[in-house]
Swiss-Prot record:
One of the Pfam families matching this protein, by short name: IreB
Disulfide cysteine pairs (residue numbers): none
InterPro entries: IreB
Coiled coil: none
Species name: Clostridium kluyveri (strain ATCC 8527 / DSM 555 / NBRC 12016 / NCIMB 10680 / K1)
Name of the protein this chain belongs to: UPF0297 protein CKL_1325
Stated family: Belongs to the UPF0297 family.
Transmembrane regions: none
Length: 83
């Protein structure tokens, strides 16, 4: 590779992977504590109230690393099959 070529960095793929990883961990923690993870995550996304998410395994801290609008964006893209 020549030193004159510009390398393009795609942050969206790493952001998508991080969002998926965090949501999976939060989902698993909610399941282990006996909660309905979909209902709890929807409550959090709508209200912004982190108490919808358990502290178990640091799930609440993890989900707060992501912006709610970014989570919704990734979920919507996945639902619609948009890359």
């Amino acid at each position: 590779m020549s030193k004159d070529n510009t390398i393009q960095f795609d942050i969206s793929e790493s952001k998508k992977a991080l969002t998926r990883e965090i949501l999976t961990e939060v989902y698993d923690s909610l399941i282990k504590k006996g909660y309905n993870p979909v209902n709890q995550l929807v409550g959090y996304l709508i209200s912004g109230d982190p108490t919808y998410i358990t502290n178990y395994n640091g799930a609440r801290s993890l989900v707060r690393k992501l912006e709610r609008d970014e989570i919704l964006e990734e979920v919507l893209k996945a639902y619609l099959g948009i890359k």
